[in-house]
Amino acid sequence: MSGRGKGAKSKSKAKSRSSRAGLQFPVGRVHRFLRKGNYANRVGAGAPVYLAAVLEYLTAEILELAGNAARDNKKSRIIPRHLQLAVRNDEELNKLLGGVTIAQGGVLPNIQAVLLPKKK
């Protein structure tokens, strides 16, 4: 009678930490990078989840704006130029990625006011 528990518990299917957190970005991989990167001696359980969520949010934000830029240019595929336009036209993203060069991104069209023809 003793020591046999309440019956056999069937082992449930493995569920990734990403799906538990409702994320698309890989929490396990982020955790591995945090451990291997020598950022700290120990890494808490919540840190990779939080970082993966932040990375996913930033990626979604940039892709949303780049998709809008592609649609404005009547294109169905996002190219580096659309990423550049999206980042540089958004004040906060431009500040965050100020020192970043996007390959094949080009520059923002900008003509100084003094160079424009004078209106009569």
Swiss-Prot record:
Record localization: Nucleus; Chromosome
CDD domains to which the protein is assigned, alphabetical: HFD_H2A
Q: Does the keyword Iron-sulfur apply?
A: no
Q: Which residues carry this modification: N5-methylglutamine?
A: Q104
The record's InterPro entries line, in alphabetical order, gives: Histone-fold (IPR009072), Histone_H2A (IPR002119), Histone_H2A/H2B/H3 (IPR007125), Histone_H2A_C (IPR032454), Histone_H2A_CS (IPR032458)
- Enumerate the residue ranges of region (Disordered): 1-22
The family database entries (Pfam families) matched by this protein are listed as: Histone, Histone_H2A_C
Modifications made to the protein after synthesis? Monoubiquitination of Lys-119 gives a specific tag for epigenetic transcriptional repression. Phosphorylation of Ser-2 directly represses transcription.
Identify the GO cellular component terms for this protein.
Answer: nucleosome; nucleus
Per UniProt, location of the Glycyl lysine isopeptide (Lys-Gly) (interchain with G-Cter in ubiquitin) cross-link in this chain: K119
**Which molecular function terms from Gene Ontology are attached?**
DNA binding; protein heterodimerization activity; structural constituent of chromatin
Superkingdom of the source species = Eukaryota
Query: What PANTHER family does the record point to?
Result: HISTONE H2A (PTHR23430)
Quaternary structure, from the entry: The nucleosome is a histone octamer containing two molecules each of H2A, H2B, H3 and H4 assembled in one H3-H4 heterotetramer and two H2A-H2B heterodimers. The octamer wraps approximately 147 bp of DNA.
Protein family (similarity comment): Belongs to the histone H2A family.
In Swiss-Prot or TrEMBL terms, this protein is called Late histone H2A.2.2
Q: Which organism is it from?
A: Psammechinus miliaris
Query: According to the entry, what is the taxonomic lineage of the organism?
Result: Eukaryota, Metazoa, Echinodermata, Eleutherozoa, Echinozoa
